[in-house]
Amino acid sequence: DAIVNHMSWESKQFQDVLAKGEESEYYPMFLTMSSVFPNGATQEDLAGIYRPRPGLPFTHYKFAGKTRLVWVSFTPQQVDIDTDSDKGWEYLMSIFDQMAASHVSYIRLDAVGYGAKEAGTSCFMTPKTFKLISRLREEGVKRGLEILIEVHSYYKKQVEIASKVDRVYDFALPPLLLHALSTGHVEPVAHWTDIRPNNAVTVLDTHDGIGVIDIGSDQLDRSL
């Protein structure tokens, strides 16, 4: 399991940044609001950011005594990695290297949908995200690692992702199966079995629960 988007605030890297601020070698490794919006963010910019939690994806931390708004997609304890930075990429590749050295054959990319931030976008499953996924898959192939993507998203996004990686989770199956069992109508789940990606991993439940988003309307495009 490789967590692409974030790492613990208790990690040695982030603790070094807290102590040394911009003097830390790891300073570029973590995203702040200003690193994504160097010229400031408008209300529209901030409102357009997709986040699976209430509120904005920032929390206050002091870097060598100076307050900074650190990007946190999930919780204040999970600080987001700048996957564009050399240090951020080196960290992710160190995980791949360790997995390969441990004879792992499959690697799951956790929260990768949030891993590529860009001003003026939703910062979730954007074209930049797909470039990140492709880059990670290329590195996986070099190390003999097959890539499994973990993304809760609109089903058409899942189909698109599946064409670019080795495996995706079939998160749409659990709610559709429950619907069939509770209503007696099997048409929706039967239709899904016709269009689901052939490289999908069957899922019946997860530690996050059963997600309605995976069979709902597109959270980023209400016209769909």
Q: Which ranges hold each PLM region?
A:
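Acidic/aromatic-lined carbohydrate-recognition and catalytic surfaces
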Residues: 1-90, 97, 101, 112-183
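Short, flexible coil/linker segments at or flanking structured domains
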Residues: 69-71, 95, 135, 189-200
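Hydrophobic residues within beta-strands of alpha/beta enzymes
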Residues: 107-109
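Active-site-proximal substrate-binding groove within the catalytic cores of carbohydrate-active enzymes
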Residues: 187-224
